[in-house]
Amino acid sequence: MNLSPYNDKKIKVILHDGSTFEGFATHNSFEYSYAEFGVDAECLQLGEYLIRDEEIESVELLESPASIRNTEEEMAMLFSVRRSFSEHLKRWEDNELPDKYDNNCFEYSAQPTQEEFERALNYQKERGDSFIKLEGDFPLADDFGLDSSVTLTMQLTGPTDRWIVNDEIEIREPGYKDIKEIELKHYGPLYGEDFAVRNINHLFEYLDFRGAYIGERLVGAYYFYSSDGYTCVDGLIVDEDFRCRHIATTLLKHAVSEASGDVVFLHADQDDYPRKIYEKLGFAEVDKLYEYLSTEK
């Protein structure tokens, strides 16, 4: 099978045993040296998975109309591979950052059975993970005793000309050292410095960042991903020592301007205060993600 046309494409690989893997692919052939992996033929690499041509039943290009959901899926696949797991569950897996809940979860298409949930729980335990996360487009009738939350997708629907901005601020691409410092200050106490550093390294490798500077000090930042006329703005953070100085709105206005006519959207916890701020700025709810999490060991 000629696998070269699938290089750097978003694909679904179906194996002879019926299992599936979805993500961005890299084509590797026998011309490369993969002896350490036992690979001596053409293969596709999706994340940490190397799939030889002899295992492959078929390959499908995941081509869908441009939309917010398609952009969200592409952004997720920068980090994780989605693979079949059970009748009602698919598994998102990021082996570079296996302890990040959002990148290593189970996506449900219908109410999972108790047997499916227990299998997923055992899978997590076998990996050495102390958490399990389920997510989907609708609330579960049986949440298996997990803590629930809802993340909103919010699309900008109004103008930005009345947004108050801070003229002291210069927006530019931040250096890694600056991003690491502000992320550690904000997230280190919440998640631990080790995880915070590994997470920012992961994000910095795959996404574009913009930072708000007052002088040479980074006082706020966000990252973004654009695809087919849609731009997702995420990871908005403001230095706690510089709150109430319109830094967030200055950053968001720059993001909208740089998007150059794209549909701009972001995410907010349904029950958190930032949602109200976004609504005042003209962002409106267009989608929901229902999430269920347990971090008990």
How should each PLM-predicted stretch be described?
Residues S64-R127, G192-E193, V197:
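N-terminal charged segments
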Residues K100-A110, G229-E240:
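Conserved acetyl-CoA binding element of GNAT-fold acetyltransferases
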Residues S109-I169, P174, P274, Y292-S294:
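Acyl-donor-binding surface of acyltransferase catalytic domains
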Residues F138-S148, T249, Q270-K288:
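Conserved active-site alpha-helix within GNAT-family acetyltransferase domains
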Residues Q114-L121, V238, C244-S257, K276, ...:
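Conserved acetyl-CoA-binding loop-helix of GNAT-fold acetyltransferases
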Residues G192-D239:
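A conserved beta-strand-loop-helix scaffold within acyl/acetyltransferase catalytic domains
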Residues S67-E72, E168-E181:
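A short beta-loop-alpha structural element at the N-terminal edge
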Residues M1-S67:
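Conserved RNA-binding domains used in RNP assembly and mRNA/RNA metabolism
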